[in-house]
Amino acid sequence: MESLLRQLSICNELIAQGPACPVGNIAWLNEFCATFLDFASELKAHLPEIAPRWGAPEGGNNIEVETIFLCLTQVVTCITQLERTINIESKFGHETTPMTRLHFLDRIDWCVRRIYVSLSQLDLHQESGAADNLEDHTFVELMDLALDHLEAFMEGLGNTTSNFLYIEEENDTNDACQLGSIINHIVRHALAFANVALEADKKALSELCETLLSECTTFLEGSAELNPGHRKLEALSLERALYGLETFLNEALLHSIFASLVELENTPINRLRHALQEQESESGLTEKLVSDFDTNMDRIQQIGVLAIAFSQDVKTKTIVRSCLASLESLDACIVPALQSSALHHADILEHHFNDEMLIFRNLIHDIIDSRSLVNNYLDMLAESLHIHIAGKSVPREYLLIVQMGSVLAEHFRLPVNYSALSDDGKRVHKDLILILRECLAAVSLATPVDPKRIVKRLKILYSVLAKLRDVIDKNVHDSVFNLSSRRQITNATRTLLRSCKSKSKRQRSYVKQSQDSVVPDPHNYTSSIANSISNDGDLISFQLTEILRIN
């Protein structure tokens, strides 16, 4: 441990030299990379000793280890951007990018210091054997904890001979927390998402949280005089409230994913940049664009938090966290940068934003189950057609629903999703792309089109998507419909994850299920560095990315 901390101290000293280095001088960054590479290699070799509980069934979710993985990934990301910055400096001069250099140096410095703190905490945890905190658990982990409590309680009802009924606490650390506290944390996660969810979903999420709290209170305050049958009904009601909240939250999550990705297409960062530079003539529009951008960034953060919760792969979790960290860091400075006259500073931050967003989008598409995404869009499309029949639709709603269909096209553009389709599925997918193009052309024309013609195409789109859903359904494993136990029947309704190696006993159908979850290469996360190898700094960045692969 002392050797690791000493190397981190050297890294801090090298980073401190960064702001004062001459124009185009990459030697100091190379030296930092070499030192950091030594640190990462040693950390990888000694991780089992430093964090013996990491990866173990009884304590694999160590927040300090996850923080270290995040910081390692962020350092590599920032090094890549620093290389671009230094190359621009060597071409145009130091005065072009001082803010950019400081931005990435500050992020690296923070990450290195945070790794130092996390390693120190791990050392303390080894000595004290500190237990996990509920604050460190994800929404999915909390759901499993609550359901495990209820499952143990109902099993105990069949064995008890006493009138005094209670929840038996397990020796396991995760089960040592009281059910009421677990439910409160679940509600906290749900309300955090509800704050950024679409308006149509906010009220329902709030009501489901109230129902869950009410059922929890009824269950926890249940009288000892009640018979086991009555207590079991209370437990089942609480379990039903938990599943109801999770199911609706995931439907709302998919709604938010459609809305956020469409918003990114409608308001790309370069359009925001243009609007900010022309703000004198369109100040009202500019304010709205900035407000919408901020709202969408908040929504993307919550989407990412839930994506991390549903993903069971360490690499995927780490890269999603890194994307969120980059986007959060950029959120505070990108609008001022786009408004400033520092063109190179704005160019680099815009490029960085687009890179991180592309990685994030592809990871989200890799995590989400194709069938759930199709079903969710079919529901929205059916509602849109119903609104038209009621005579309440407007042209913008047609455009929006078709743009959401383009999110499906983007989903299947990812090789891992397209390759999962059968031959019939690929034929139907081809039809989907054709009808989507027709629909988009119809709703995008400057000349108004008869709504009946648009609706006719939307109905064809619905029919094609229904066929695609049916084809995907045929590929679903029979295990989803296994009727061997009550728990499996209940879980079949849990609608985002590929079948993956999960610590959870409950499989979520809204997430892809895969044999061995492997982080996709959405933007060729490593090859994008390898392809630009033109100097020592590029080479070391590539080596760092390779060494930081997590087994």
UniProtKB/Swiss-Prot annotation:
One of its GO terms (molecular function) is actin filament binding. GO terms for biological process: cell migration; cell-cell adhesion; cellularization. It comes from the Eukaryota. Pfam families: Serendipity_A. It is a peripheral membrane protein. Gene3D superfamilies: Vinculin, Vh2 four-helix bundle. Its main location: cytoplasm. Disulfide bonds: none annotated. Keywords: Cell membrane, Cytoplasm, Developmental protein, Membrane. It is found in: Cytoplasm; Cell membrane. One of its GO terms (cellular component) is catenin complex. Required for the cellularization of the syncytial blastoderm embryo. Involved in the localization of the actin filaments just prior to and during plasma membrane invagination. Sry-alpha together with nullo and bnk may provide auxiliary functions, by acting both to stabilize a large and dynamic microfilament structure and regulate its functions. PANTHER family: ALPHA CATENIN, RE47911P-RELATED. This is Serendipity locus protein alpha. It comes from Drosophila pseudoobscura pseudoobscura (Fruit fly).
